[in-house]
Amino acid sequence: MENRFKSVFDIIGPVMIGPSSSHTAGAVAIGREGNKLFGGIPKKVTVHYYGSFAQTHRGHGTDYAIAAGILGFTTSDLRVPKAPEIARKRGVDIRFVEEKGESPIHHPNTAILDMTDGHKKVQLAGCSIGGGAIEIRRLVIHDIVVEPSGTLPIVLFIDPERKIKNQRSLTSFLQQKAPFNESRIYKSPDYYIYEYDMQNYFKSSLIGELKKKYKNIVCL
């Protein structure tokens, strides 16, 4: 069986505000990945809960945790419990929906975030797997469904030029700078999306170099 935890700290969980590493810290992490994918704070978010998230989100602080992550807060930020109020004051509309039936990504702690600013729309489907750790199992960008292996970190390159040479260049860059386990390409008439399941998180300097060299890069 594949080990989803990289260290004992992934099992214990992070320093956090809230009652549960799975339902609070993990939910903050899902919200933060939504913020990264969107490229900032969206104007409207609909959060679809499945499984135990749908049953216990109010009591376990999942709502304010998701909102905090969307605002870019960390798990230890003292503002986490007040995140829904802060979001409202910033003009961010966040709604929570309890869905019935099985999770589309097959995990009991599932949150699917539909995010928009009135022009751009993206979707992120994540699950909390314990100890504050999460997986991102599905993304929808420009109506293209992207299905990573789940484990973070993930690099996405959204290519409106639809040129394979761009993928080759990025692949060569990553092979030299940062190893990855798998890569995939997703195509539509308007965009190509290249997705890489990375082995390790980047240093901030490398993220800066990557974003300078390639436009439309997303590092989750």
Predicted regions, residues:
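Acidic-glycine-rich active-site phosphate/pyrophosphate-binding loop
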Residues: 1-8, 39-43
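C-terminal edge-of-domain segments
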Residues: 85-127
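Short glycine-rich or small-residue beta-strand-to-loop segments that form or flank ligand, phosphate
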Residues: 12-20, 47-52, 69, 153-159
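A conserved regulatory-domain signal marking ACT and ACT-like small-molecule sensing domains
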Residues: 96, 125-220
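Conserved phosphate/anionic-ligand binding catalytic regions in large, soluble enzymes, centered on
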Residues: 13-33
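Non-transmembrane, aqueous-exposed alpha-helical and coiled segments at domain scale
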Residues: 37-49, 74, 81, 102, ...
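A structural-propensity feature for long, helix-poor, extended segments
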Residues: 46, 50-96
